Amino acid sequence: MANAPFPKLSASLDQGRPHRVRFCPSPTGNPHVGLVRTALFNWAFARHHQGTLVFRIEDTDAARDSEESYQQLLDSMRWLGLDWDEGPEIGGPHAPYRQSQRMDLYKDVAEKLLAAGYAYPCYCTTEELDTRRDAARAAGKPSGYDGHCRDLTAEQKAAYEAEGRTSIVRFRMPDEAITFTDLVRGEITVQPENVPDYGIVRANGAPLYTLVNPVDDALMEITHVLRGEDLLSSTPRQIALYRALIELGIAKDTPAFGHLPYVMGEGNKKLSKRDPQASLNLYRERGFLPEGLLNYLSLLGWSIAEDRDIFSMDELVAAFDIKDVNANPARFDLKKCEHINAEHIRMLDVKTFTEACGPWLKAPFAPWAPEAFDAEKWTRIAPYAQTRVTVLSDITDNVDFLFLDEPVEDEASWTKAMKGDPVALLTTARANLEAADWSDPESLKNAVLTAGEAHGLKLGKAQAPVRVAVTGRTVGLPLFESLEILGRDRSLARVDAALAKLTA
């Protein structure tokens, strides 16, 4: 094994090579927004540099991985529009792209590391490790692996095996500091006592993440590793492993590393994938646009300009520079996420918006019977709805008055609107509306305006009882356009029903 001084690694290892990045999730549970942000930054980096995004599945944990989660990952990436250049369903020169199908490769690399002295068998039992770790803590010393099996003789190994002990494989860390320049955090130096020898193969022969991840990066010629801050501590170990892989002819170079900031949730705690607001499925079910969600997630650690929050994916790709990513934790703000999504909804052309709302206009989201839906009325109301909704699922409550036989019953809205003398106001408004031109929303507005004036009310106060009578809600789409689209007979019938309820 070579003993040359450990090199100081630069953040830029382009060397004229095309940029190759990877997104490598594990198929466990539902995709979450932190995972999406990592995928987005890798995708934007690859597209900005006309590079390659490798989509790799880290499915070596048979107890936790599932085919359902794997399919969810693929579906989520497709829904988000984050296309990949190599990986599942596409293939590529480094296939297969599922780690569970690459076990022979890892076994071969582990054997080469052992043969060259970069790794060694460790026979320590869990109890022995715990005892020595506790003793180190009590003495105020580092509690990592103490190198007990680092330099066993052949006789000592044979003796352990004669006892029936099994062994894991540990990688031998260099006895010197490792310095690297993180693309996000700058120069980082880690002392050897803080990075002990670590396991790379289990006793049953199964390779660990600590081996398979950097081996795949090496074999797939990854040039830049952009990942979460939680993996920063593993970087010195991987850099040391890369040095060994390079000397064995398995890797060409050590990639540049960039560690993205934590995403914080409620109470300034790191957003966990178990937090309800972390689930990507939540945003899909609520009707976030992929562009709106990605726009917001890109702001968790990066910005396109100090005074600009809304931009397209093309603009993101054109501007994205990993060196502009902030190392400080980013707080997830649902309200801001909703605001940005609403702006992206406004940016859609009406036809695209109309089509995008489709799923929320039928079962299981829509409370009306399928035959009650009127496509012509929906097409007419859609432009007004587009200026009001925050997420696409908002559309159901905004237009249900058109397709239900009767407006929804909301006692809070009813109580709020029917103050003063609502019977007198609605009676006058009904008479004025009956005589109005129902092809002209302005005529309907004047009908309610004059009714209000007759009772000493401004338009805002006067239209509230009419709105609740017709739509069931105090807040909604422009009232007079809504009345026109609902139609004269149905609108007047609902005012009559409200009067009957008030006088019962």
From Swiss-Prot:
Where, by residue number, does ATP bind?
273
Any idea where this protein resides?
Answer: Cytoplasm
Q: Where is this motif: 'KMSKS' region?
A: 270-274
The cofactor binding remark recorded in the entry reads: Binds 1 zinc ion per subunit.
* Cofactor list: Zn(2+)
Could you say which EC number(s) this protein's record lists? Answer: 6.1.1.17
- InterPro entries with a match to the protein in the record: aa-tRNA-synth_I_cd-bd, aa-tRNA-synth_I_codon-bd_sub2, aa_tRNA-synth_I_cd-bd_sf, Glu-tRNA-ligase_bac/mito, Glu/Gln-tRNA-synth, Glu/Gln-tRNA-synth_Ib_cat-dom, GluQ/Sye, GluRS_core
Pfam families named in the record: Anticodon_2, tRNA-synt_1c
* Molecular function GO terms recorded: ATP binding; glutamate-tRNA ligase activity; tRNA binding; zinc ion binding
Q: Where is this motif: 'HIGH' region?
A: 25-35
Q: What is its main location?
A: cytoplasm
- Residue stretches in coiled coil: none
A GO cellular component annotation in the UniProt record:
cytosol
Q: Which residues bind Zn(2+)?
A: 122, 124, 149, 151
Cite the entry's keywords alphabetically. Aminoacyl-tRNA synthetase, ATP-binding, Cytoplasm, Ligase, Metal-binding, Nucleotide-binding, Protein biosynthesis, Zinc
The record's family statement is: Belongs to the class-I aminoacyl-tRNA synthetase family. Glutamate--tRNA ligase type 1 subfamily.
Q: What is this protein called?
A: Glutamate--tRNA ligase
* Organism (species): Streptomyces griseus subsp. griseus (strain JCM 4626 / CBS 651.72 / NBRC 13350 / KCC S-0626 / ISP 5235)
The root-end lineage is:
Bacteria, Bacillati, Actinomycetota, Actinomycetes, Kitasatosporales
